[in-house]
Regions:
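N-terminal acidic leader/helix
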Residues: 1-27
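Short, charge-rich amphipathic interface segments used for partner binding and complex assembly
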Residues: 24-61
């Protein structure tokens, strides 16, 4: 899978996870999270794990 396609898939998963768990985030925050955690890592996670990782990511900032 190309980098762009993998990244787009990760962004879509993050958006879905955040929506499912009522977490607000801007596009810039989502992009920063995907860059930090890497798309291939995010694409291997369940939505609940993505939401938890995002919460931890924003708590660290």
């Amino acid at each position: 899978m190309s980098f762009e396609k993998e990244r787009a898939e990760a962004i879509a998963l993050v958006e879905e996870a955040l929506e499912d768990f009522d977490i607000d985030a801007t596009r810039a925050e989502i992009n920063s999270f995907v860059d930090a955690y890497t798309a291939d890592t995010i694409n291997d996670l369940e939505l609940v794990d993505i939401a938890e990782a995002y919460r931890n990511f924003t708590d660290d900032e």
